[in-house]
Amino acid sequence: MKSRGASAVPDTPSVMSGHALQQHQRGGGGMRWRECAAVLGAVAVVVLVVTHALLNVGDDLGDLADPVARLRAATDEKAALLSKKTPEEAQAEQDIKAAGGADADGSPWSSEMLQWQRTGYHFQPDGNFMNAPMYYRGLYHFFYQYNPKGVVWNKIAWGHAVSSDLVHWHHLPVAMVPDQWYDINGVLTGSATMLPNGTVILLYTGNSDTFAQVQCLAFPADPQDPLLRTWTKHPANPVIYPPPGIGDRDFRDPMAAWFDKSDSTWRTIIGSKDDHGHAGIALMYKTKDFIKYELIQDPVHRVEGTGMWECIDLYPISGGSNSSEEVIHVMKASVNDEWHDYYALGRFDAEANRWTPLDPETDVGIGMRVDWGKFYASTSFYDPVKQRRVSWGFVGETDSPNTDIAKGWASLQGIPRKVVLDEKTRTNILQWPVEEIDSLRYNAANFSGITIESSAVITLPLRQVAQLDIEASFRLNASAIAALNEADVSYNCSTSGGATERGALGPFGLLIHATNSGSEQLAVYFYIYKGLDGGLRTQFCHDESGSSRAKELLKRVVGSTVPVLHGEALSARVLVDHSIVESFVMGGRMTVTSRVYPMEAIHAAGRVCVFNNATGSAVTVEKLVVHEMASAPIQPYRDA
């Protein structure tokens, strides 16, 4: 491993390995186009090709016969069997097969490519398949869905790992396996609850011998063991069956219980759906002993048209001193129909068993997403040591099931996120990597203060691009913003052509895992436009469409509108860890997660670039600091 001693961050753009920072512009002046330029629009790409030809630059351009068509083509999509995939992905898999998307001789991946895809500082098991953290006696515990016998979701057990800092993890033996009639087809999602006497209990969904979903109870076999290595399933299991009117397979994921003083009972919420109106619902149960439960008659919340809710979370994010009505609660649900996590802010009345959104227009399942990319089944816990709310989500693969089998592993967890209320807007949460992640930083390089002209690309001279923490903020020319007259209400990350769709004030941002020729790159960018009301709107997007030459992948353009207040610079923190890229935008008002599987832009062939594809403004990069990130391998736990 390289030295982790952090070097001083230089005040000016640094020069590494003998390569100076280069800005490549469209047009004359003797400037040459080089790395990453294929992201730019039709006119710019034509000039790129011509300039390379005239100046006889030796870069291998690859297949650039129609680069714009390549970048703007419809996304290649697929679905992995029994994985967390959207319905549109399932249809896309059939389309890919029909079109002969996979190589005729089998997998297009070399062992070197597959090895590169494995992450360095994210939580990932040694092998096989991945899917509520808690804090107990000085350690963070993470129980996760795990298939010891394969890389697909089947016969799920509970893996177990511990950490002292949420970064460096140690594997423990499997906590629970499907060995009873009520969980023989899987020990599904659940939660841990700490009781006042220090006892920990687990509530989990068992997938029974008839595939009915029932709720079950487990407790530590040795409560004095701080590692909680062995668990005993309660003889009264199952402790909760699906109630009348609820489908046997639509009743899962009990959240961590909390004590309610209004009637001195413990409460938990279970996700389900109501076929009347295709509504997602949150069912609340109360108990005094965790063995006998009473269903509270009306759901704590219900939203028509959203379908099955799972992995529900409800927690206070802000509170006043006068009355409970001042407390703002987050309700979050993983919407099974779409495989996306949604949240909303609202008020929770415990006595009435009712959560009410502050804004019905942004209710659960129809408004704000926890993450706009590949991210699902997030759960949170309260960290009593640092007095913070921490959320963690599952990040699946977007390659094929056959590739997962070839790799021997599938999926991982995103970086743990601290969650707070955005006090500036009070309409959204802020999610930010937990501070412990910063301990992995080393060798910072500072490129702040550069200006990117229209249609220009700058290649950053970095030593490696596989594991990075990038802090960036941008500001447009004020006169260009003032000159923006025409309203553009049609721009949307997913439907507007990605990074090649040029406007007066966008797109501009970063290219991750890019090749010299531009044959591969993930574009991470802002796009500003004017609405019909004359107000400016800002979208932040990940354009995955050019991220790999492989045809078997799900490659989309994802993102949405992000709130930007007057005077704020456009900022993003981008965590790069091989095949996962996570963006935290405007201080965490929005997050976007992508999986990328380049075939060429790996090892020394990968690049990171800054680009400006806006037609009407230069972009000032007020801050651009790139930290290399050390690995945090997961080790087996060994007693001292």
Task: Describe every region a protein language model picked out.
Residues 1-36, 63-72:
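Short, low-complexity, Lys/Arg-enriched N-terminal segments of secretory-pathway carbohydrate enzymes
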Residues 87-132, 150-152, 167-194, 225-260, ...:
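Surface loop/turn signatures of beta-propeller and other carbohydrate-active proteins
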Residues 139-142, 198-203, 263-268, 323-330, ...:
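Entry beta-strands of beta-propeller and related beta-repeat scaffolds
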Residues 199-242:
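Carboxylate/His-rich catalytic cores and anion/metal-binding grooves
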